[in-house]
Structures are given as C-alpha cells and as structure tokens.
Amino acid sequence: MLGAYLPILVLVVIAVLFGLGSVIFSSLIGQKKPSTVKLAPYECGCEPVGSARERFSIKFYLIAMLFILFDIEAVFLYPWAVLFKRLGMFGLIEMGVFIVILFVGYVYVWKKGALEWE
C-alpha cells in the first residue's frame, strides 16, 4: 500500500536535493565581494524609502491572523461541499455548527474593532 507513494517520495527527495545542490553550488563558485549596493535593501527596482528595519503596525499581524483563520475555514468547507451528498444530514449539521462558531468569532472580532483601520 505504501508502495503507491514511492514515486511521490522520490520526487520530494529529488526536489530537496536539487534545491540544496543549487544553493551549495552557487555559494561555492559565486563571487563573494559585498558592497554597499549589494547590501542595500531592494524595493522593486526603486530607490529605498526609509529604513528597511522599520517596525510594522500590529494591525498587519492581526489582519494576517484573521486571514489565516478564514482561510482555514475555506479548507474545511471545500471537502464538505464535495462530499455533501455522502455525508447527509450529519454533515449538514456538523458544518452548520462550524459556520455558526466562525460567525460568532467574526462578530466578536467586529465588535472589538479589529476590522477597523484607524
């Protein structure tokens, strides 16, 4: 049974070896002459504005965490939608409870003002 996964394992091993080999090979034969231009932060070909070590507002992290939360919701809803007929009423109730819990969390975040950008 595990033999069916052997080609995937071989592909993963080859991909990891190729990635590591590329990094090691380039570090061995590449030039190692740092300069101020090479050490400067890169901003899409434009001149850097301000410091690259500037601190981000906590709001960015909050939005990222909320995105991950609702992205996980989509990950759980997709298989449920595919297997809807096979799961029957149990699956419908189970997903209903899941969506209600997420909706309560969304309302909580909304009431706390986490979605307001000021």
UniProtKB/Swiss-Prot annotation:
It holds the Pfam family Oxidored_q4. Its EC number is 7.1.1.-. Keywords: Cell inner membrane, Cell membrane, Membrane, NAD, Quinone, Translocase, Transmembrane, Transmembrane helix, Transport, Ubiquinone. It is a multi-pass membrane protein. The chain crosses the membrane at residues 5-25, 62-82, 87-107. It catalyses: a quinone + NADH + 5 H(+)(in) = a quinol + NAD(+) + 4 H(+)(out). One of its GO terms (molecular function) is NADH dehydrogenase (ubiquinone) activity. It is found in: Cell inner membrane. GO terms for cellular component: NADH dehydrogenase complex; plasma membrane. Its main location: membrane. NDH-1 is composed of 14 different subunits. Subunits NuoA, H, J, K, L, M, N constitute the membrane sector of the complex. NDH-1 shuttles electrons from NADH, via FMN and iron-sulfur (Fe-S) centers, to quinones in the respiratory chain. The immediate electron acceptor for the enzyme in this species is believed to be ubiquinone. Couples the redox reaction to proton translocation (for every two electrons transferred, four hydrogen ions are translocated across the cytoplasmic membrane), and thus conserves the redox energy in a proton gradient. HAMAP family: NDH1_NuoA (MF_01394). PANTHER family: NADH-QUINONE OXIDOREDUCTASE SUBUNIT A (PTHR11058:SF22), NADH-UBIQUINONE OXIDOREDUCTASE CHAIN 3 (PTHR11058). Belongs to the complex I subunit 3 family. This is NADH-quinone oxidoreductase subunit A 2. It comes from Citrifermentans bemidjiense (strain ATCC BAA-1014 / DSM 16622 / JCM 12645 / Bem) (Geobacter bemidjiensis). The gene is nuoA2.
